[in-house]
Amino acid sequence: MPFWYSNSKLIWLLSPFSLLFWLISQLRRALFSLGLKSSYRAPKPVIIVGNLSVGGNGKTPVVVWLMEELKKRGLRVGVISRGYGSKSKTYPLFVTKNTNPIEGGDEPVLIAKRTNAPVVISPNRQQAIELLLSQAECDIIISDDGLQHYQLQRDLEIVVMDAERALGNGFVLPAGPLRELPSRLKSVDFVITNGGKNQYSDAVMRLVPHFAINLKTNEKRQLNEFQSGVAIAGIGNPQRFFTMLEKLGIQLKQTQAFQDHQHFEASQLEKLAENQPLFMTEKDAVKCQSFAKDNWWYVPVDAEIIEAEKQRENLPHFWAKIDKLVEQYRNG
């Protein structure tokens, strides 16, 4: 919501509801902390990759980056997710690169396609982990989202944040974009800011596009081969994608933002770009592959994670913590 990042009067009208939201969420977290509500401890270490605010922070590229880095260290990685946007009739659901995104959710299917790792979705994270471990050998589990899912005990928490929007107006929902107060950041292990650094940054992420891939033929082209086109995005922060294309020298004749996790139909897109390239995100492409036209292209991005400050050693400490964590579980 635009007013989350301004001084709109709506903030004060909605603030009583935010107070109620905060009280309920704090009570819920306290019940888990005190052991008055039961939580699940997985037999393998669990890393949460989540957000303090809603929408468009860049969490999925961090999950993919983390998985690839863990695999380089010789670790077998599995992923669980709530599967937001999934319309599966049964849960838990084992997701592969061939799973219909309507059933598996766009982000879980994207993660499965990019990493070939085992992915399971379920609103019940315990059931997701139990199915995951029954079907795959895993040394470590990544929970895609779930920072506020306190039914699941965790060993390490990573928060991904948009560097520019940060925490918005500092209010929790619905007056602001936050799921918890900013003070929650004091208890997480690592904060990655997307697109630059701010006061909260432990590390900075840059999203790097390398080429465009045709949805129908899988042909790859360098992005500098395109002069103009139309762009669509059904992600949390569509403008970030449009700006990236423009910075690459592509003149966008038209842009169309859709809601996050939008389920597309061919009729929505066909008329947008009949005689010119249509660009979309990789997340949107997994939902459009089955009805793609010859001129539809998606632009995959890779996350580059660097230190927030040159003199600091946050990343080595982060990896040392993970190595120690895995060793503890292996030794019982």
Curated annotation (Swiss-Prot):
NCBIfam families: lpxK. The keyword Zinc does not apply. Signal peptide: none annotated. Pathway: Glycolipid biosynthesis; lipid IV(A) biosynthesis; lipid IV(A) from (3R)-3-hydroxytetradecanoyl-[acyl-carrier-protein] and UDP-N-acetyl-alpha-D-glucosamine: step 6/6. It comes from the Bacteria. This is Tetraacyldisaccharide 4'-kinase. Belongs to the LpxK family. InterPro entries: LpxK, P-loop_NTPase. GO terms for cellular component: plasma membrane. GO terms for biological process: lipid A biosynthetic process; lipopolysaccharide core region biosynthetic process. HAMAP family: LpxK (MF_00409). One of its GO terms (molecular function) is tetraacyldisaccharide 4'-kinase activity. Keywords: ATP-binding, Kinase, Lipid A biosynthesis, Lipid biosynthesis, Lipid metabolism, Nucleotide-binding, Transferase. ATP binds at S53, V54, G55, G56, N57, G58, K59, T60. Its EC number is 2.7.1.130. The keyword Transferase applies. Disulfide bonds: none annotated. SUPFAM superfamilies: P-loop containing nucleoside triphosphate hydrolases. It catalyses: a lipid A disaccharide + ATP = a lipid IVA + ADP + H(+). Transfers the gamma-phosphate of ATP to the 4'-position of a tetraacyldisaccharide 1-phosphate intermediate (termed DS-1-P) to form tetraacyldisaccharide 1,4'-bis-phosphate (lipid IVA). It is an enzyme of class 2 (transferase).
